[in-house]
Structures are given as C-alpha cells and as structure tokens.
Amino acid sequence: MRVLGIETSCDETGIAVYDEYRGLLVHKVYSQGVLHSRYGGVVPELAARDHIRKVIPLIVGSLKQARLISSDIDAVAYTAGPGLIGALLVGASVACSLAYAWNVPVIGVHHMEAHLLTPMLNKKLIISNSTSFSDFIDVIDFPFIALLVSGGHTQLVMVKNIGEYKILGESVDDAVGEVFDKIAVFLGLGYPGGALLSEMAQVGIKGRYIFPKPMINKPGFNFSFSGLKTAVIRAIMSSSNDQQTRADIACGFERAVVETLSVKCYKALKQMKVKYLVISGGVSANTMLRSKLLKMMYSISGKLLCPELEFCTDNGAMVAYTGLIRLKAGLSNRDLSITVKPRWSLESLPSIF
C-alpha cells in the first residue's frame, strides 16, 4: 500500500508518499520562514493562503518525482490537528477532494502522534497482518517515554503502544520551540532563529550567564518556560550589544533549557521504570539536547531514539507514515466530510490494537 501524506498544520507545506514495503518514496517540504520573518512569528491568515498556493504544485511534483500516478495511491493522509485552523483546513480540503476523486480512503492524522512516530521513518514498515507491527519492536520496545518538543508543544508522554498515550507533563505556558524563536529575535537573529541561536551558543562562554531552570525541583512533569524567557530577554536588554555577549547569553539560555528537559526526562524514566526514550519535534534537532540525553540514557543503560535531522521539523513523511499505520489497523475513513481539530489531545486517540 502507498499513502500520500499532506502536512499543513502551521508554516510548512509538506508532501510525501510512503510505501508499505519500499519505505519513503518521496518527500518535499516548503517552509514559509521568509514570509513570516518580517512579523517575528507566524501570521495564521498568511500561512493558510500560502498553503493554498503551494500544496497542489507540491503534490504534482512529488508524484512526478516518484513516477507515480493517481491509481498508485491507496489512501490519502492529512494533518487534522492540532494546529492553526485555517492552515489545517487547506490540507483537509485537498486531502478529502483527492480521496473523493481517486476513490480511496482518507485518514486524519494527529500532528503530535506523527512527530512521535517520526524516529521510525528510516525503517521500512514490515507488517504481517493488521495487528502485527514487528518493525517497531526491532527499533524500540514498548512502553517508552516520548519527549515532544516543537514550536507549539512541549510534552512528556508515556507510550504503552501506538494509540495508547498518557500525557505525563506539558508546558503550562510557552512551548520550548516558541521560546527559542522569540529569544532568537531579541538576539537579532530573525525568525525563525532557533537553529541560529544554537549555532551562536556554541561559541558562548559557559557559566557567564546562568539562567533559572524552571520547575525542575517541583513534583510532577510539567514545564514552564515563560519565566526563563523573561529572564533571558532582560539580560539581553541590559547587556552590551557585542557579539560575544550575545553568544554567552545564548549559551546560558540553551544550557538552561537542555538541563530542564533532561531532568524531567530522567525523572519520568525512573518513575515509570522505562528504559527507552524517544525525542521528536523541531527542537529534537538541537545538538546539545541530543548529546545530553544520549549521555543520560547511556548512564542508565537505556536507549535513545531520535529522528533524522530532516524529519525533525513538520513534514509530510511523518503524516504519510502514521496514516499507513492507521490504515493497516482499519482506522481509515470513507466519510469525506472535512474535519479538523485545532485542539486535540493525544490521549483521545484510539489504539491500533
């Protein structure tokens, strides 16, 4: 089976085709970063309009690159939520229209479940029947803890199986990726600037700026980054504008974030008595975070699974992949009514088993 995946939840238009046996056949991503950079953040109306302009050409180009025609596609998967409602509606409308025209089922995919499963993308999905997903056992054992870190979410999730999720903790205010981008703007790096901030931090002097590590000593697994954001912005506003000082602030900020995330992960792994950790989402590309978590997992004889760097940010490949899993589990839909969920809890998803 082959599934076309369509991702339009925020400011990336992602298209991909995933084959049950051959793996990922093609994937293309168009980022709206330049469009939104002048505003210092995503403008929802502009995002939706740009998806409208880009989604069809990307689909046509992807099918052409993979040497596929419409009859080669067995289902269409799209991001149904969570996300920006206007952006979501673009992908949903196109997906349902194609499913109707091609007479194939449609699958509305949860954006964060797709991120959660992204680290498995570099493996072919070998399915012996609708309830035997042997490849996942080869990659990582259930249960595991997932750290989902992106521009819109910061969550620690207990994963008992695909579709069986328990949110252990999440940010009570700003998502960590959002804070990275906001601090980057104040550092003069523009939007989106999270990756540039990390590059700047590499030449910063460790220890010159020490910022609070929010909620690491509090019970539970929730996060809070608004106080850290305020502390860093104040440091930027009160400091000299030289490049080294900016790099030192970036270094202190990044270290505070990474330490906070790693402490919460460690506590969750210990309390849940789990040895496997998955990280995904845009911030999972952060080199310092990967290194810190890798050392932590080695110290407890655990295993860390990360996405390939090109799949950390939003993309259609993760949507197609997740759609295929749910299609094989019999969870597709012939009802072509256009449905999106700007707010949608992982815990409400049905299990594939």
Curated annotation (Swiss-Prot):
Catalytic activity of the protein: L-threonylcarbamoyladenylate + adenosine(37) in tRNA = N(6)-L-threonylcarbamoyladenosine(37) in tRNA + AMP + H(+)
CC annotations in GO: cytoplasm
Official protein name in the record: tRNA N6-adenosine threonylcarbamoyltransferase
Gene Ontology terms, MF aspect: iron ion binding; N(6)-L-threonylcarbamoyladenine synthase activity
Alphabetical UniProt keywords: Acyltransferase, Cytoplasm, Iron, Metal-binding, Transferase, tRNA processing
Positions bound to Fe cation: 111, 115, 314
E.C. number(s) listed in UniProt: 2.3.1.234
Gene3D superfamilies in UniProt: 3.30.420.40
Family from the record: Belongs to the KAE1 / TsaD family.
Binding site for substrate: 148-152, 181, 194, 286
Pfam families on file: TsaD
GO BP terms in the entry: tRNA threonylcarbamoyladenosine modification
Free-text comment on the cofactor: Binds 1 Fe(2+) ion per subunit.
Lineage: Bacteria, Pseudomonadati, Pseudomonadota, Gammaproteobacteria, Enterobacterales
Function in brief: Required for the formation of a threonylcarbamoyl group on adenosine at position 37 (t(6)A37) in tRNAs that read codons beginning with adenine. Is involved in the transfer of the threonylcarbamoyl moiety of threonylcarbamoyl-AMP (TC-AMP) to the N6 group of A37, together with TsaE and TsaB. TsaD likely plays a direct catalytic role in this reaction.
